[in-house]
Amino acid sequence: MRNSRLAIACLLTLLLTLGACQSEVAYHHYRHVSSPGWDKSDTLHFNIPPVRESGNYEMLAELRTDKNYPFHKITLIVSQTVIPEGKSFYDRLDCRLINQNGVIEGDGISYFQYQFHVRDMKLNKGDSIHLCISHNMKREIMPGIADVGICLKQKETGRISDE
């Protein structure tokens, strides 16, 4: 009987510890890209509402593609302005969609979903973000891009860079 109580206590401790490391999603939204594809001049805008808590956050860019996307990679340009501070960040992401063996790295069957780390940032309670994202490919119109999204997650633990 004592061993089973100890086992249950250990299991509960493990579950609580793992649960404490979870990230809380503060914002998650997609913008649809109209046919025939994502135009280089079509910058997508996201207005992330004020965060409820001060803390460390992780910004992710997300893509949904279909079989019509013609390349193995895509380069994304992400610019962010934290309001009211006015601090701006500019990130260039070189995103691999298909590996060297021709295997799609996204999740899905007819549409493939990808997530790419943009940056970690420290935000204060009430900070909001205006974010713009565009592609930086030589081809003007990128077929096969269905949706572009942004996810902001609050990080519970770990170190953060504030670049």
Q: How should each PLM-predicted stretch be described?
A:
Residues 29-51:
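Post-signal peptide N-terminal segment of mature Sec-exported envelope proteins
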